[in-house]
Curated annotation (Swiss-Prot):
Identification of the protein by name: Adenylosuccinate synthetase
Subunit relationships: Homodimer.
Catalytic activity: IMP + L-aspartate + GTP = N(6)-(1,2-dicarboxyethyl)-AMP + GDP + phosphate + 2 H(+)
Cofactor names: Mg(2+)
Cell compartments where the protein resides: Cytoplasm
GO CC aspect terms: cytoplasm
Length: 447
């Protein structure tokens, strides 16, 4: 039995969907614990591409129970579209369960999200405009609509009438936007409620019962560590906690039941939207990474910013999440490069900085200090074992594992399930030992 968390170790878009899909083969339950339709997972199976935003990647396995947890925010219109798309591909959603305490994204959330971002002007943060932030804000303000409210039709009308009138004042007076028609919104969401009702459960209890039965549970993260509301590169972050601790809170389970935490990172770095990005590239190499890596967002279609692997933020992700091992994705994207760089530290105001600054202003002033390594300049997408990889690719991976101080358990060399090398058992492998008092090579400045 193992309870495993899969976490993004960068700014999201690391390939968690594929890794979760791979691990779902041995999972009895897959749980999505936070975020909403601002996240996108792409899974390719036998030539078919599945793009999911809310539904856990484990849905492709009919015997795997998939739970959308209480820490998520659910847009029913998007969720129903995803379910319909899966049905069209002969994928059942009978194994999908929705937490009754998850919050619901409403039309006014989307409008407020987009209007607020536009009003920020040059201070915009790069929101997806899907209403995620305003939904979480209502949750904190304790005026949100939860799934349990959605399916309680008697109380839903009363709650929504008050809330829509309240939001209409903001839309009209602050943003000069037309008001929403409360009756239209209420009728729309009552229809959603009837369709989703059979899937609604007490998710915390359902997960707890699975733990008691010693089932294998996989907790699927959305976004990435550097987008965490508390521990990310604030204010250019999401509105939830996509770290290992957030998976426990958003699922309603205690941290002591977690056996392993797996971090997913690209062999380079990408970021969507605004915010500092020390290793960001421009020119020919950046274009190559974007083209070969198909770096366009699943949710928004926005072009991702591309740069070299940043071991400073990687080490930060190891620390914040307590990572036990890594899955490195898109190694094949680097196949044609003559040389590859890894950021091992920053130069900040004339001083060497080996840890992530908390200040966005300081982070924006960080200049990368690189270690340059030779490229392998041969294709790796057909490699299926470490022995198949070019020596330079192996050296690169060994360096990443050494500087991050966690073993690399999975190497992904393409979007398909079979384009993968399993180095060690990512689920039942050993727990990562804490460092001894002599510190690490990183602390001793050996890199």
């Amino acid at each position: 039995m193992a309870n495993v968390i899969v976490i993004g170790a960068q700014w999201g878009d690391e390939g968690k969907g594929k890794i979760t899909d791979l691990l779902s083969r041995s999972a009895d339950v897959v749980v999505r614990s936070q975020g909403g339709v601002n996240a996108g997972h792409t899974v390719v199976v036998e030539g078919q591409t599945f793009k999911l935003h809310l539904i856990p990647s484990g849905i492709l396995y009919p015997d795997t129970e998939c739970i959308i947890g209480s820490g998520t925010v659910i847009d029913p219109s998007v969720l129903l579209k995803e379910m319909a798309q899966l049905h069209a591909l002969n994928v059942t959603t009978d194994n999908l369960y929705i937490s009754q305490t998850a919050h619901v994204t409403m039309p006014y959330h989307r409008l407020l999200d987009q209007a607020s971002e536009e009003k920020r002007g040059k201070y915009k943060i790069g929101t997806t405009g899907r209403g995620i932030g305003p939904t979480y804000a209502d949750k904190s303000e304790r005026i949100g609509i939860r799934v349990i409210d959605l399916i309680n039709t008697e109380n839903l009308r009363q709650k929504l009438e008050w809330t829509i009138n309240y939001k209409n004042v903001i839309l009209e007076k602050l943003y000069n936007l037309p008001p929403l028609d409360a009756k239209t919104v209420i009728e729309e969401y009552l229809e959603y409620a009837e369709i989703l009702r059979p899937h609604v459960v007490d998710s915390s209890l359902k997960i707890y019962e699975a733990i008691r039965k010693r089932k294998n549970i996989l907790f699927e993260g959305a976004q990435g560590t550097l987008l965490d509301l508390d521990h990310g590169t604030y204010p250019y972050v999401t509105s939830s906690n996509p770290i290992a601790g957030g998976a426990c809170v958003g699922s309603g389970i205690g941290p002591t039941v977690i056996d392993r935490v797996i971090g997913v990172a690209k062999a380079y770095t990408t970021r969507v939207g605004e915010g500092p990005f020390p290793t960001e590239l421009e020119g020919e190499i950046e274009q190559l990474l974007c083209d070969r890596g198909a770096e366009f967002g699943t949710t928004t279609g926005r072009r991702r910013r591309c740069g070299w692997f940043d071991a400073v933020i990687g080490r930060y992700a190891v620390r914040i999440n307590g990572l036990d091992c890594l899955a490195i994705t898109k190694l094949d994207v680097l196949d044609t490069l003559e040389e590859i760089k890894v950021c091992v530290a920053y130069q900040l105001d004339g001083q060497t900085c080996r840890h992530l600054p908390s200040s966005a202003g300081e982070f924006a002033r960080c200049q990368p200090i690189y270690r340059t390594m030779p490229g392998w300049q041969q294709p790796t997408s057909d490699c299926r074992s470490l022995e198949d990889l070019p020596k330079q690719a192996l050296d690169y991976l060994k360096f990443l594992g050494a500087i991050m101080e966690v073993p690399i358990a999975i190497i992904s060399l393409g979007a398909s399930r079979d384009q993968t090398i399993i180095v060690e058992d990512p689920i039942h492998g050993p727990k990562r030992a804490l460092l001894d008092e002599n510190g690490s090579p990183w602390d001793n400045h050996e890199f």
